[in-house]
Amino acid sequence: MRVKVDREELEEVLKKARESTEKKAALPILANFLLSAKEENLIVRATDLENYLVVSVKGEVEEEGEVCVHSQKLYDIVKNLNSAYVYLHTEGEKLVITGGKSTYKLPTAPAEDFPEFPEIVEGGETLSGNLLVNGIEKVEYAIAKEEANIALQGMYLRGYEDRIHFVGSDGHRLALYEPLGEFSKELLIPRKSLKVLKKLITGIEDVNIEKSEDESFAYFSTPEWKLAVRLLEGEFPDYMSVIPEEFSAEVLFETEEVLKVLKRLKALSEGKVFPVKITLSENLAIFEFADPEFGEAREEIEVEYTGEPFEIGFNGKYLMEALDAYDSERVWFKFTTPDTATLLEAEDYEKEPYKCIIMPMRV
């Protein structure tokens, strides 16, 4: 193999591809890229056996060939070379990387040791890259990190009536972003795949999305790259049934004001969970934290509220993460009872069609 590539373009390609590698895998080959010099391109393949990425960069190919090389080492070298172009060629069982006055040699592995890739089907439906990024960012914080129900370890993407639903839940909270649009597929995309996908689609106008015939893979593609994602098995819970529709108390809060209050309260807590009690009375909301070991705090916010006195407790971390996902300057808190789910919703829902449902906790 012998190829000449623009250094900055190669760096960008390797930066994207390394997200799909597995650095701590039992199979060392998963920490490698498969490089293929063919016709007028250098093709880079990377996989962790959940995500299969193929991305290419234009190059001057003098000799075709392919080889496996450690992904992070190659990326670090290319990133720090002080040259406009990078020259890659194989020399026995080494990959020689040259740029300017610098030369590096990395050990390689045979191309046949690299995992076989699924045949990635291009085409299908098209969604804008910005829409996908927004959807992922709105709901990824609510996705379960450790959950017996494997279906909760990913984002649920589907069309629903005249909207597209992006959904994440860990059983204690649920985030739903539902912009207007059409989408006919149902995809349950793993948490790590969302990280890979988000880096690929940021700044991209359109992304093609297809699904394998056996429904085990989703295929995302643009002219520059192709990604096959192994979908999660299982059925996502009926999330629509848990969204409350009737409320006993509603308050419109300034998003940033509540976030600052919660951050100050969190300063007294040393655990991941910090209980916050919210008490509503006429034109006043009180946020309180109390811990025998770490102290007590009380914050008051003036609000427009004329209903009956109301008291409820939350994991403050859940409130902070939900509010962080809003662009809206003001957010509705819609309460049912102290023991049932609360709905957070943007002031102008048509402008920002995003809601979060949070279960209360005893404080």
From Swiss-Prot:
Its main location: cytoplasm. Gene3D superfamilies: 3.70.10.10, DNA Polymerase III, subunit A, domain 2 (3.10.150.10). Belongs to the beta sliding clamp family. It comes from Aquifex aeolicus (strain VF5). Forms a ring-shaped head-to-tail homodimer around DNA which binds and tethers DNA polymerases and other proteins to the DNA. The DNA replisome complex has a single clamp-loading complex (3 tau and 1 each of delta, delta', psi and chi subunits) which binds 3 Pol III cores (1 core on the leading strand and 2 on the lagging strand) each with a beta sliding clamp dimer. Additional proteins in the replisome are other copies of gamma, psi and chi, Ssb, DNA helicase and RNA primase. Keywords: Cytoplasm, DNA replication, DNA-binding, DNA-directed DNA polymerase, Nucleotidyltransferase, Transferase. The lineage of its organism: Bacteria, Pseudomonadati, Aquificota, Aquificia, Aquificales. GO terms for biological process: DNA strand elongation involved in DNA replication. It is found in: Cytoplasm. GO terms for cellular component: cytoplasm; DNA polymerase III complex. Confers DNA tethering and processivity to DNA polymerases and other proteins. Acts as a clamp, forming a ring around DNA (a reaction catalyzed by the clamp-loading complex) which diffuses in an ATP-independent manner freely and bidirectionally along dsDNA. Initially characterized for its ability to contact the catalytic subunit of DNA polymerase III (Pol III), a complex, multichain enzyme responsible for most of the replicative synthesis in bacteria; Pol III exhibits 3'-5' exonuclease proofreading activity. GO terms for molecular function: 3'-5' exonuclease activity; DNA binding; DNA-directed DNA polymerase activity. SUPFAM superfamilies: DNA clamp. This is Beta sliding clamp. It holds the Pfam family DNA_pol3_beta_3. InterPro entries: DNA_clamp_sf, DNA_polIII_beta, DNA_polIII_beta_C, DNA_polIII_beta_cen, DNA_polIII_beta_N. The keyword Transferase applies.
